[in-house]
Amino acid sequence: MPSEVTPKVPERPSRRKTSELFPLSGSESGDIKANSEPPTPAGTPNVPTRRPILKAKTMTSFESGMDQESLPKVPLQRPVRRSTTEELNNVMNNTSKELEEIESLISKHNIHSVSRKKSPTSVQEGKAAAIHQNGQRSASDNKTSTNPSPLEKNEHKGDEGNESAISPSNSVNKSNNEVTEHSDSEDLTEKQKVHAALDNEAGDGSHFEEKLIPGDMKVPVDVSKDVEEGSLNALPPSGITESDDKAEKFTKHPESSLEELQKHQEQQEEKIFQNPTDEESTTSLNEKQEGKDNMEVNSQPQGPSDTETVIAATSSNVPSQIASEEENDVPVIPRSRPKKDFEAHVQKEELPNTQEKLVSEECDSTLISTEEESKIPKIPSERPKRRAPPPVPKKPSSRIAAFQEMLQKQQQQDLHNNGNSSATTASADIAKKHTDSSITSDTTKADFTSKLNGLFALPGMVNPGQLPPSLEKKLSSPDTESKLGTQDQSQAKTGPLGGTRRGRGPRGRKLPSKVASVEKIEEDDNTNKIEIFNNWNVSSSFSKEKILMDTTPGEQAERALDEKSKSIPEEQREQSPNKMEAALCPFELDEQEKLPANAESDPLSQLPQTNAVGNRKAISEESLSPSEAIANRDQNDTTEIQEQQMEDQMEVDMERELSGGYEDVDSALHSEEASFHSL
């Protein structure tokens, strides 16, 4: 791509400098300036020539409604994620050891705790142990924590509610490490606290609900939050409300709470089982059960939680604060017993990886054991049972049994007949050669063989007495075939033509008279009638113009005479035949005179005239049908002769026209005019 097409990305505009909420010293302000971004110039920023591809997703001042709002600093490095499985295993091991020690202590001091009374020394010892423990925790926090930058202090002062959400992974890891490091140091203090709690319980039975847990057994403190903030030089302002305390309590790590809840529950159960007289006091616990959130908030209204968080955060001012807050450092025991469902829920959230590992290991072990067991052959404890005998077939029905008996009888009869015929022929020959004893033995053998041959039928075998129908037809004589044909015909005649079926009309009603009066027609197949009729007739009718154009004047005269003869009745023909002939003769003479001399010399021209007259009379006498005319034509040659004469006459006329038989042109024209007028 050319350089002109590629877009130029403008530089990102620098942010404005945020205002400081609190003034800082010179050293701190120098560090902040070194770490902060370079300040923007006093003049207006340069507007980019082109629009950037993606718009910066930052909150503007008018959207938030605050012009001077401190923004949290994004860490330069991403926090390293640590595996929680090892830490959880360490926590579980430490808690199991602590529980064993507590159980041993409770079993030793259980008998003496009932007779003891509450003393001021025990209370003072518990307070001193709690103060000593807080001091140890603050010292360890100072060792492990790093000095934060001044910018982080400002962020903490500006927005305390969002601190718990900035780096939750670091806080979780640090809290886990602190629990594992201080587990040994807390063992001694816990023993003292248990003694104090037992003394308090024995001294006053009415306050069992309030003093059931020792001094240190309370809702855990969010130490990780204070570690992130670092060691502050001054305490937070006194305007912190109860809502801040509640928010801190909800962000506390669940592992420490789980440990203390387990301890509290086990101690409470052991005390109840060992002291049955105190069961009446525990009835009020079930009545006062509340939700998880209310339990955590109401358990410590303004007690040691606030003091402990402040002491853990400020290591330099610990001794001065302890002296002023010794009176409020008395531990507070929650009034309601925690729910078991909550414990199970927390435990499931805390230990998901360990449970998955245990389940996977159990599955692997079960698979390995099943594979090993499958390889080892097993000896059956019981001997396999024998198969039951096949079921007995049911008896056939009466009809099937009767049919089988009939077939067996027929087969036996056929075999017996065949065996007798073969045995008679064999016995006649053997009688001449052997004695009666030999004859009887031979007959028995022949009977036996004949029976065997008949019993086993092979494909293609036929009984000798019965032939297939195809062979019988071939071998039978023509006389027998004719007899069979006549028998079949007689059976066909005698049998009905077709089965008469009753109509599907309504039953119980009479048919109408028209249908009932109809007679059935019965046809006789023996009689045959022949009828002959004419399917078609030929009639030719030509127009007069075509006839005059095609025929000669002589033929025209003949046709005119035929028409006249038809118009004259037959009686007149019989009376005056001579007159008709006389009338015809002068007409013919006139025609002959008109003809030229060449035509007179031709003898063929006279033949058609004479023959035509004779034939005309014959045709006029009878009007024959086309079939009769065709038959007469085939028998007589008169029609062929007439056709030949007509052809000859046509040739003569053509030659005369072509040769110019007319002497003058005028005669030819007059002849044409005469023919035209005649048309």
UniProtKB/Swiss-Prot annotation:
Keyword Phosphoprotein: yes
Phosphothreonine modified-residue sites: T18, T58, T85, T277, T552
Keyword Zinc appears in the UniProt entry: no
Residues covered by region (Interaction with SH3 domain of ABP1): 383-396
Annotated spans, Disordered: 1-95, 107-522, 548-679
Phosphoserine: residues bearing it: 36, 70, 104, 183, 206, 231, 284, 324, 576, 620, 623, 625, 627, 667, 671, 675, 678
Biased composition annotated in UniProt, kind: Basic residues: 109-119, 501-512
Cleaved signal peptide residues: none
Stretches with biased composition (Basic and acidic residues): 9-19, 179-213, 243-272, 339-351, 372-383, 471-482, 556-576, 667-679
Cellular compartments annotated: Cytoplasm, Cytoskeleton, Actin patch
GO terms under cellular component: actin cortical patch
Complex formation: Interacts with ribosomes. Interacts with ABP1.
Role of this protein: Involved in mitochondrial migration along actin filaments.
Family: Belongs to the AIM21 family.
UniProt-recorded name of the protein: Altered inheritance of mitochondria protein 21
Organism: Saccharomyces cerevisiae (strain YJM789)
